[in-house]
Amino acid sequence: MWINHEIEMKLYCNGEDDIDEEEIDEIKVEEMVEKILENKEYWDKKCKNLFADEFVDWFNEEKWVKPEYDEIYYETNSIDEVEKKLLKIIEKEDTEKIMKNNFLTKEAFKKLLDNEDMEITIDLTDDDENSFSITMYERLFFVDKIFYACCNFNGEIDEYYMG
């Protein structure tokens, strides 16, 4: 999907993910995957837009406390280093919104998703909660959100949410 993006596919049948292999119609599953992969650019754009809408709305609703960030923090020796990287990726106006006001625009978030210096991973934490992180040059930038897009057998998104 996006540069450095890891994709995990899960198969659900009637809302259950513990499925008896004999119940699975492998041809139907393969057809669904083919449909999704045939329209890669469409899915990239659609999922990216949905993800940006969900994540950015959540991000901007939070009341971040400076300099102690609640769920947003920087693991680096210098905040200036992070600011320089952001200036290169999302330019001055959006960088100032993040650094000064903790406000993220959807367009800036999409640029972060597309940047080769950003990596998106899905981790399983010790307490078995899914977590989502964007890493920039091994510096953690956002944490604790994951985007789910659930597709049906027609290759359409049935539902999507952040957890």
Which residues are covered by each model-predicted region?
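N-terminal domain-onset segments
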Residues: 1-129
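Acidic, proline/glycine-rich low-complexity IDRs
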Residues: 2-8, 113, 117-163
